[in-house]
Amino acid sequence: MGNCLHTAELSPSTENSSQLDFEDAWNSSYDVNYSFPDVDYDANLEAAAPCHSCNLLDDSALPFFILTSVLGILASSTVLFILFRPLFRWQLCPGWPVLAQLAVGSALFSIVVPILAPGLGSTHSSALCSLGYCVWYGSAFAQALLLGCHASLGHRLGAGQVPGLTLGLTVGIWGVAALLTLPVTLASGASGGLCTPIHSTELKALQATHTVACLAIFVLLPLGLFGAKGLKKALGMGPGPWMNILWAWFIFWWPHGVVLGLDFLVRSKLLLLSTCLAQQALDLLLNLAEALAILHCVATPLILALFYHQATRTLLPSLPLPEGWSSHLDTLGSKS
């Protein structure tokens, strides 16, 4: 960490002017009575020397972005191939449409990671950056909402369970996710060759809306699922939301939602940081939370594969074998 914002150097004209002013004040020091103005020692942090931590996700982090993108695309493609291969038995995973959409969301995120990566210089444009943030957060919002529906509806999402339910949820979830990305899409662009959200007074309403959306989807949604699970279990009202390994997805986005909310409070001066160390710590947490969120595109396919393995191990013994397999096993049994 350190101070990465450098103060502007004085121009020669400014230095000469300052020197003349100092000499005039020195020569007249015996004839003038000075009155010292009151000094406001409680000025806010931004009025003091720059007090921000170095950005961890700068140009040097470009290999991290590229490697994560490649691994995420390969892993998501593998999961999609498994789910859509011709011999796949759909009854092994009643909620396979949700799993497929989670893999698609992870793949979309992986594709746009290089677009928002630093170090690409002049290749960034405002339109491309806005599109990147739209897909970046849209895929994440959709995945979170899909996980919430999967936990709440469980096996009712299987094919043939409730006609039209899966299609309706798919259209609704991705539509809501697209609407939630409008604020960050409109409040982002290219600045200094980097894709970044634009913080300005004119866009404060959009920034607030985006922050609220992140808090609701990444923070409050998993907390609500956990709360409903515990409440139903305590009151004996049934099992509650279906808890499984897929909930591990929120580990990668929950910190991002929390730190983004804190950063908005600080920028809005609703939360004042009293020391430089606190501001530097917040900057560091922002970078770490963003890096953790980026890693979800690699972890999500692995989580899906583990969930599929658990589902097949649980349901396979109870499923009837195909007709050809059963006759073949009967033949082997008679020979023995």
UniProtKB/Swiss-Prot annotation:
Glycans are attached at N16, N27, N33. Keywords: Disulfide bond, Endosome, G-protein coupled receptor, Glycoprotein, Membrane, Receptor, Transducer, Transmembrane, Transmembrane helix. Disulfide bonds join C51-C276, C129-C195. It is found in: Early endosome; Recycling endosome; Membrane. The chain crosses the membrane at residues 64-84, 96-116, 130-153, 167-187, 208-228, 245-265, 288-308. Residues 85-95, 154-166, 229-244, 309-336 are cytoplasmic. CDD domains: 7tmA_ACKR1_DARC. Its main location: other. Residues 1-63, 117-129, 188-207, 266-287 are extracellular. One of its GO terms (cellular component) is membrane. It is a multi-pass membrane protein. It comes from the Eukaryota. GO terms for biological process: chemokine-mediated signaling pathway; inflammatory response; regulation of chemokine production. GO terms for molecular function: C-C chemokine binding; G protein-coupled receptor activity. Belongs to the G-protein coupled receptor 1 family. Atypical chemokine receptor subfamily. Atypical chemokine receptor that controls chemokine levels and localization via high-affinity chemokine binding that is uncoupled from classic ligand-driven signal transduction cascades, resulting instead in chemokine sequestration, degradation, or transcytosis. Also known as interceptor (internalizing receptor) or chemokine-scavenging receptor or chemokine decoy receptor. Has a promiscuous chemokine-binding profile, interacting with inflammatory chemokines of both the CXC and the CC subfamilies but not with homeostatic chemokines. This is Atypical chemokine receptor 1.
